[in-house]
Amino acid sequence: MTRRPLLVSSLAACFTCAVAVLGAGFSAHANAADICVKVEVQNVRAQQGQLMVAAFGDAASFGKKPMSQMRVPAGEATTTFELCGLSGDTVALTMYQDLDSDGQMGRNLLGMPSEPWGSSGKPGAFGPSWDTAKVALDGSPIVVYLTQ
């Protein structure tokens, strides 16, 4: 069995989530709203582009098929919005700030994100996984910190 280095595996997981956000057809509220939650995004580059947000309901769909997704204009350094269309008792959010509003996450020559990105929960240094990004839908706001 061949083992991939941890860095490569972790980056692949991060980019898988980014692809899910990028590949999703964005709309204000893609699914019927069952549960709504307040989302607070910190470290936003104020007034630049938009936040591309995807919400996943379980490990099987994480990075593949979001249950809800939306675009949010980048406001202040801390941007707050309501995300609806959620169900269940757990959710994981992934997002990036599309600085140039081209609908795609910018990448450098190594394929690393060149635009700010983040996830809910306690993301690892090399990108989120379901286990690190999942948070309870208990009425508390979800806080996401964007990595520059």
Where do the model's predicted regions map?
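Beta-strand signatures of extracellular beta-sandwich domains
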Residues: 52-56, 92-94
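A short, solvent-exposed beta-strand micro-motif common in secreted/extracellular proteins
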Residues: 89-99
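Extracellular beta-sheet/turn segments enriched in Thr/Pro/Gly and aliphatic residues
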Residues: 115-148
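Short proline/glycine- and polar residue-rich coil/turn motifs
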Residues: 71-77, 136-138
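A short, amphipathic beta-strand motif
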Residues: 35-43, 53
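Exposed aromatic-hydrophobic patches
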Residues: 78-86
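Acidic, glycine-anchored loop motifs typical of Ca2+
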Residues: 99-106
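C-terminal segment of classical bacterial N-terminal signal peptides
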Residues: 16-29
